[in-house]
Amino acid sequence: MSEHETAGEGRFNSIEIRVLGSLIEKQATSPESYPLTLNALVLACNQKTSREPVMNLTQGQVGQALRALEGQGMTRLQMGSRADRWEHRVDKALELVPAQLVLMGLMFLRGPQTLNELLTRSNRLHDFDDTEQIQHQLERLISRDLALHLPRQAGQREDRYTHALGDPAEIEAILAARQQEGGARTSGGSVSEDRIEALEARIAALEARLAELEG
């Protein structure tokens, strides 16, 4: 079995997903400090902005995730005289072009998103001309079982997309929550997009807490 096949079949917990997303983001936005030290990566994982949900991970949790990911070919440690640093290997392990890597990173950090959200949030990371370019790359990821298309529920204006590398139970929880939200809007009126995102963040936070307890 090739490295690509092994990595592609892997499933990662919420902490590992946050670690990968943070490394991908900082490679693009802070190239002068990338690869990252463990301390810098912990700060990146726990950012209050551009993270859904906001997490409060320890160095031990991030270090454990890095070692697990290293064993799957998704991260690599660079030994240094002053400090050891970590880099991701997502693009190489999954054979992704730069545009696909950016989209996976955004979905790792913020979960299900619309095409317009991905376009807006990618402006510091990659130069997409429009949502059609994003949709084309997402369709390629979906064809390889790396991403999922989530049809809009009742009361929603747009479809959403998310990565498919998390725990299957977490993905099912997201889908179930969306179905429940859609039913609530049909019977009880409209619910704001902010409310939807808040519910998604609460679900993800509970899943992250469960992953911490199990770890």
Curated annotation (Swiss-Prot):
UniProt xrefs under HAMAP family: UPF0502
Pfam families linked: DUF480
Protein name, entry field: UPF0502 protein PP_2442
Lineage, highest ranks first: Bacteria, Pseudomonadati, Pseudomonadota, Gammaproteobacteria, Pseudomonadales
UniProt source species: Pseudomonas putida (strain ATCC 47054 / DSM 6125 / CFBP 8728 / NCIMB 11950 / KT2440)
InterPro entries: DUF480, WH-like_DNA-bd_sf, WH_DNA-bd_sf
Sequence similarity: Belongs to the UPF0502 family.
